[in-house]
Amino acid sequence: MENSPLTLDRFLSRFQLLRPQMSRSSLNQRQAAVLVPVVRRPEPGLLLTKRAATLRKHAGQVAFPGGAVDDTDASLIAAALREAQEEVAIPPEAVDVIGVLPPVDSVTGFQVTPVVGIIPPDLPYHASEDEVAAVFEMPLAEALRLGRYHPLDIHRRGNHHRVWLSWYQHYFVWGMTAGIIRELALQIGEKP
């Protein structure tokens, strides 16, 4: 980031919107969506969760609220908003969706669409005990600092994957979540 502080207005002016996917026509059974919640503050924050240790997949990992698209979802955006409400009690009407990032393929076979939205600073988060162990906020300027992410090349089932690693306080941010944050940084013009 440049030396001046990252304000919400500055973030929004640099965010180059992609056309949001609004219909279900392109969806198949392996689609998922996550909400990338930017907290509206003079110096914005990025809301993240730590998944419950009891979950079958990605237990204990830092993640954005989100999950698989289900039959009731009219769109990928609707899926992200529903999941955010289920996991951390963010009301869909409180989210100002500003766009989507390119979909990411997960190691579990889902194509995950990150939905970027602005949320008010005074929301009372209530973590779903079955899914979320903790909810925390990271300063957006710090989250988007590309130098904080370190690559790790792994080989799985004969395929090469590059994942990104970082720490924030006592939280280990890596994998798809770190990749989505990096993509957001690149989307607003940060240089690697």
From Swiss-Prot:
Q: Where on this chain does Mg(2+) bind?
A: E83, E87
User: Where is the motif Nudix box annotated in this sequence?
Assistant: 67-89
Enzyme class, top EC level, equals hydrolase
Q: What Pfam families does the annotation carry? A: NUDIX (PF00293)
Top-level taxonomic group: Bacteria
Keyword list, A-Z: Hydrolase, Magnesium, Manganese, Metal-binding
* EC nos: 3.6.1.-
Coiled coil located at which positions?
Answer: none
Q: What Gene Ontology terms for biological process does this UniProt record contain?
A: nucleoside diphosphate metabolic process
Single GO MF descriptor: coenzyme A diphosphatase activity
SUPFAM superfamilies, A to Z: Nudix (SSF55811)
Q: Which residues form the Nudix hydrolase domain?
A: 29-160
| Matches recorded under InterPro entries | CoAse (IPR045121), NUDIX_hydrolase-like_dom_sf (IPR015797), NUDIX_hydrolase_dom (IPR000086), NUDIX_hydrolase_NudL_CS (IPR000059), Nudix_NudL (IPR023735)
Q: According to the UniProt record, which cysteines are disulfide-bonded?
A: none
Tell me the cofactors it needs: Mn(2+); Mg(2+)
Keyword Magnesium attached: yes
Q: Which family does it belong to?
A: Belongs to the Nudix hydrolase family. PCD1 subfamily.
Q: What is this protein's function per UniProt?
A: Probably mediates the hydrolysis of some nucleoside diphosphate derivatives.
Q: Which NCBIfam families match?
A: PRK10707.1 (NF007980)
User: What is the designated name of this protein?
Assistant: Uncharacterized Nudix hydrolase NudL
* Gene assigned in the entry: nudL
